[in-house]
Amino acid sequence: MSHRLFAVAAALAVVVLVALLVQTPAAGQNQPQAGKAPAVGKAWTPPRTADGKPDLQGIWTDNTLTPFERPKKLGTKEFYTEEELADLTTRARKGEKLEEADLGAANPQAVRYDLEVYGFDRTKLRFASTKRTSLIVGPEGVVPPMLPQAKERNAERAAKEKGHEFDSYENRPLSERCLLMNQERIPMTPGANEGNLLQIVQGPGYVTLVHEIDHSTRVIPTDGRPHVPQSMRLWQGDSVGHWEGNTLVVDTTNFTNLTAYRGSSEKLHLVERFTRAAEDTMIYEFTVEDPTTWAKPWTAEIPWTKTKGPVFEWACHEGNTMISTILRGARVAEQEEAQKKGK
């Protein structure tokens, strides 16, 4: 066991060092190049690493205008036509420009950042190159309804936490405490523009994912090892990978009930598939299964676009006074309430 732990630690040190060498101190991210969405090449053959595995390395972004769930008005329509996609893209980018102009007019004294440099320029985003109407695949295009037992479980949890949100730092969300940000949770889905970059670094027997946000690092062994014992539970679960042709398949189990994904339980089972479909395109697909939360598994497919980078430094906890200020404010509010009641 000690030799195994030493091997894991050594591999982690190498891949993290490689990732850190290409990072630059700053804040923000790069956007994918504007213009026509890349076609996913069916016959494209990815380059190989020194040990002969498909080379997934690079800096990727999942920024997209495609919604996670399909709008109800589209019904079972799974794909847009070229004409529909072009029209939607034009209107979406125009809307973003108008919104930015309205914000500037409302507060001309506000500090305005260079949105393109800092990765907030949504006018350069595009819909998924797959032309899907939603990132969730299938005729429904939405997350399946939650089972009654799952609704009851989540309601009980919410009721237990109600009124205790500000008791202690342990009652605050993990993101406020800089422990686990939304963009680094798995499965990985598009969120706010900022912090969405992901760098992939490979070594013999390992694939490492380095998130821009919070610099979290996920090391995935691909050497055929089994999952850790069920008694070991982790916020991000236990991930093991293997190769199926040109696709990296990652199986993750052993979640806790503290980091529920969309109301899931510790029974969550996640299968991710990473396929490099073109020089600048990665298809990230994941299937979610939790028999205590949903009646059936469901799948989403998210095209990633390669970007030049660099991955800027993203600082969270340095100079962070959020938690102390929130708790201090809560104590003041409690004192004021007690004074009103004459206590």
Language-model segments: residues:
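PEST-like low-complexity, intrinsically disordered acidic/proline/serine-rich tracts
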Residues: 2-343
